[in-house]
Amino acid sequence: MINSEDNTSTGLKNGGGPGYIMTVRLAILSRGPRLYSTRRLLEEAEKRDCYVEVLDPMRLSITVGNDEPRILNAGWPVEVDAVIPRIGYSITHHGVALIRQFERLGVYVANSSDGISHSRDKLHATQLLTKNRIPVPTTCHIRTWQDVEGALSRVGGMPVVVKVSEGTQGSGVFLVHSEDRARELTYKLLSEGNHVLVQEYIEESHGRDIRVIVVGGKIVAAMRRRARGREFRSNFHLNGTVENIDLSDEYANVARRAARLLNLDVAGVDLLESNRGPLVLEVNSSPGLEGIEGATGINVAGVIIEHCMIHQGFSNVGLDQLLRSRPGHGVVSVNINRHPILNGKQIGDVFAEVNEQVVFAVAREGMHIWKPRRTFMLRRGDEIICYGEIDKIHQQLTPWVSHSVGNNNASPSTIEFSEESY
């Protein structure tokens, strides 16, 4: 345990010197203590008199049981106020388990376990973004090389981008100009056990993108990255060039929403500049700091540390578990497009026999309307999100949603509810 008199058990440093009264106990989870980003975070934490240490996640162990959960470092309990995860792709599974354990202990973690898991799976991230009307390049997930021809047609034809669902710093991303090459590459990637995506190629954004750093829902810095030579990937890691830019409101709004929807307090959002506006290419939960600090002159590391200092003591809550903890209760959603009979109806008409508020949100055009009144009128494209007793919600909705799309005589057994975690 760390305290102001003895900080030897976990090795966390007293940045303020002997006798300094403890402020924030901070751990940076990283396997690369000499990497630029890790060193900068450590430096800025020490400037602010934090107790701080870089901890190798592969040297930490987890104890789970009926007693209080624990995280051990060389046999000593790790007791901190805030954690900044810098988890590499190769140890995502263990890293996410560690973060989940810190969350159980009530420790603030800069990026939640769910946020990291979602962002590391490109397909899952794309599904979450598009569900909330965040613009992305058209993307197809394929399971066999025979699916390539159909995928090419759906994303707009050649050339296309072929990528693996999990990867970082531009690895596993290929620009392909012929169908034969796309089929050959897909076969190779699938045979290696990868999940493969075929993605629309945005010609007007060839070799460049915009990296936006979002911390706590605020835009901290933005830069344009350009590839060198014949390379089409613009990653700084791949020797691309960077320049500071002033971000437009449209691009800033998309970046903020993408980070928020993936539940990331610290995110690097990559945007393509297309003829139809900003497109989210990827959301990174461990964005590199060297390129962005060099291009903009902004102390991004300092902003991250100050954010953690402010939020230490407040842990992330798994809302899905909370909503399911009450027996018989849960979340039910209904899409108006699938049940057009609800179009033009008021919420009070649908739930006429329920006095309490059952509909806690309506998703409309990428936004959420919270706690809508009973007089709120539904329209096409809306999604009703309800919370309460599952059986009671189903009972109220059944007479309405039994009129399914293309089958107005559908029986209750064909009703389609979607029970989800929000």
Where are these regions (language model features)?
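Cytosolic Rossmann-like ligand/nucleotide-binding regulatory domains
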Residues: 338-400
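Short, compositionally biased
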Residues: 102-104, 375-376, 394-420
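Extended boundary segments
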Residues: 316-352
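Short acidic-glycine loop/turn motifs at beta-strand connectors
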Residues: 214-218, 274-276, 365-366
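ATP-binding N-terminal substructure of ATP-dependent carboxylate-amine bond-forming enzymes
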Residues: 2-7, 12-110
